[in-house]
Amino acid sequence: MKSFVFFAACMAIIALSSLVQAYPQKLPVPIPPPTNPPVAAFHNSVATNSKGGQDVSVKLAATNLGNKHVQPIAEVFAEGNTKGGNVLRGATVGVQGHGLGASVTKSQDGIAESFRKQAEANLRLGDSASLIGKVSQTDTKIKGIDFKPQLSSSSLALQGDRLGASISRDVNRGVSDTLTKSVSANLFRNDNHNLDASVFRSDVRQNNGFNFQKTGGMLDYSHANGHGLNAGLTRFSGIGNQATVGGYSTLFRSNDGLTSLKANAGGSQWLSGPFANQRDYSFGLGLSHNAWRG
C-alpha cells in the first residue's frame, strides 16, 4: 500500500509539472574542420529495480567530432546495481553521414561478452517524410557454456509528418522469432503540447512450441518544457491483459541548456490471467551534462 501511495504521489507531481509549464554533390575536397567545437556529453541515471537495489547507468559520449558531411560516433558506458553483482561495461564506435550510419559495440560483464554490429539508412521522401531501415546482429559468448546466443534484428519504418508505420523482426537464435507491426499517429500538436497514439501487434514464435500474440496501444503526451505522460494496454493471447502508465518531468535545466535533471516514474498491473492484480512500480532520476571544448 505504501509503494502505491508513493507511486501515486510521484505521478501527481509529474502531472502537475506538465500542466504548469533539413547539399549538392561535389568533387572530393579536403575535409574541413568541425563546424562546431567537440562536445563531451555525460549521462547518468538511477532507477528502482523490482528485485532490489537501484540500477545505475553512466554514459560518456563525444559528439561534433566531424564536419557537416561525416560525424564519428564514440561513447563508453557502464551499468550496475547498488546491491552488487556484475557490472556491464562497454564502448561504441561508428560513423554517420548523408543518411547512412554504421557502428559496433563491445560490452562485457562477469558472465558474458557481446559484440553488436548495426547499420542504418535514412532516405528522405520529400520535406516531411522519410524511409528508415535498420539491421543489427549481436553475438554473445557466455563463460563455461558452448551455446553462443545470437540476436538478429531488422526493421523498416515509414515516418511522415503526422503518420508512421513500421515492421520489424527479431530472431533470437535457438529461442524465439518475433514479427512486430505498428502504426502511429499524431492526434494533436501545437507550440507547447503534443499527443501521439500508437497500436502494434507482435507474433512471437518460440522454439519450445509456445507461441503467442501481443496486441496493444498507447497514448503519449509531451510538453515543450520537458514533461510527459503515457498510458498503454497490452493483451497477451492466452495469458492476460496488462496496463501500464508512466511519466517524466524535467526538474532542472541550466540557463545555458547544457545541464538537466529529469525524473521518471512508471507502473504496471496485470488485469487478468494467472498474474491478475500483480503490480510493478519504478522510479528514476537522470542527469545529463554537455561540456563544450575549444
Curated annotation (Swiss-Prot):
Its main location: secreted. It holds the Pfam family Attacin_C. It is found in: Secreted. Induction: In response to injury of the body wall of the larvae. GO terms for cellular component: extracellular region. InterPro entries: Attacin_C, Attacin_N. The modification Arginine amide is found at residue 293. Synthesized by the fat body and is eventually secreted into the hemolymph. The modification Pyrrolidone carboxylic acid is found at residue 25. Residues 23-24 form a propeptide. Keywords: Amidation, Antibiotic, Antimicrobial, Immunity, Innate immunity, Pyrrolidone carboxylic acid, Repeat, Secreted, Signal. Residues 1-22 form the signal peptide. Sarcotoxin II is an antibacterial protein which plays a role in the inflammatory response of this insect. The main effect of sarcotoxin II on E.coli may be the inhibition of cell wall synthesis, including septum formation. Belongs to the attacin/sarcotoxin-2 family. Sarcotoxin II consists of at least four structurally related proteins named sarcotoxin IIa, II-1, II-2, and II-3. This is Sarcotoxin-2A. It comes from Sarcophaga peregrina (Flesh fly).
